[in-house]
From Swiss-Prot:
<protein>
    <recommendedName>
        <fullName>Uncharacterized protein MJ1442</fullName>
    </recommendedName>
</protein>
<dbReference type="GO" id="GO:0016020">
    <property type="term" value="C:membrane"/>
</dbReference>
<keyword id="KW-0472">Membrane</keyword>
<keyword id="KW-0812">Transmembrane</keyword>
<feature type="transmembrane region" description="Helical">
    <location>
        <begin position="18"/>
        <end position="38"/>
    </location>
</feature>
<keyword id="KW-1133">Transmembrane helix</keyword>
Length: 202
C-alpha cells in the first residue's frame, strides 16, 4: 500500500483519478475506448497549438504539486484554460464549485477519448479554501439545483471511497453524468464528466 501511495504522489494523482473514473464509466454502461490524451484531442493546427499551451500549464502545475507535502496550494498553480469537451465540462462544473468553495482553479484534465456513444473527461480542481466534511452536503445540494439528480439503480448517490468523498449524478435528460470526489487530504476536487447515452434507471 505504501508503494502505491508513493506512485500516486509521484505522478500527481493522475493515475488514481483516471482509474476511479473508468469504474464510473463501467457502472454507467459505457463502452470504453481509451485514447489516453491529456489536454484534449484535436487535429486542426490551431487546436494543436492550444493543446501545447494547455499541456505546458499542466506540466507546471504537476511540478508544483510534487513539491507540496500537505496538498495543493491554490496560489501556486495556474488556472488551466481547457479546450474542446473539457471546456464544455468546465463551463457546467465550475459555477457549481464556485458556489460552494468561493473560487476554484482547474489544475489539469485528462481525456479518455470517444466511447461508443459518448465522450468523457476527468478534471481536477483546487479550491481557494480548504475542503471540509461539511462541503459534502453543500455540494450535493448545489449539483441537484443545477439539473442533476442522485441516480439509483446501480449508480449510487454519495458515499465514502478510500481517501475521498464521492458524489455520482446523472442529468435529468439522461444525456450527461458527473462524478465528483472531494479529497480533503490533498485539497483536490476530481470531476468525471461523461456526455452521451446513459444506461440507468431512476
Amino acid at each position: 500500500m505504501t508503494s502505491i501511495r508513493i506512485f500516486i504522489k509521484f505522478y500527481g494523482g493522475t493515475m488514481r483519478k483516471f482509474l476511479i473514473f473508468l469504474i464510473f464509466l463501467s457502472v454507467l454502461g459505457c463502452g470504453i475506448t481509451i485514447s489516453g490524451c491529456i489536454g484534449g484531442k484535436n487535429v486542426e493546427e490551431i487546436q494543436n497549438m492550444q493543446e501545447q499551451v494547455v499541456q505546458q500549464q499542466q506540466n507546471e502545475n504537476q511540478e508544483e504539486y510534487q513539491n507540496e507535502d500537505e496538498g495543493v496550494d491554490y496560489n501556486s498553480i495556474r488556472d488551466v484554460q481547457p479546450i474542446g469537451t473539457a471546456k464544455e465540462a468546465d463551463e457546467k462544473i465550475r459555477p457549481i464549485l464556485n458556489e460552494v468553495f468561493g473560487e476554484v482553479k482547474l489544475m489539469e484534465y485528462v481525456s479518455t477519448g470517444k466511447q461508443n456513444e459518448g465522450e468523457s473527461i476527468v478534471l481536477t480542481y483546487v479550491p481557494k479554501r480548504k475542503i471540509t466534511t461539511n462541503d459534502f452536503e453543500k455540494l450535493n445540494e448545489a449539483i441537484k439545483k443545477s439539473g442533476y439528480f442522485e441516480s439509483s439503480g446501480g449508480i449510487a448517490g454519495g458515499g465514502q471511497s478510500g481517501e475521498g468523498m464521492v458524489l455520482w449524478y446523472v442529468s435529468k435528460d439522461n444525456k450527461s453524468a458527473i462524478q465528483i470526489i472531494l479529497y480533503p487530504d490533498t485539497n483536490e476536487i476530481v470531476v468525471g464528466y461523461y456526455k452521451g447515452k446513459i444506461y440507468s434507471s431512476q
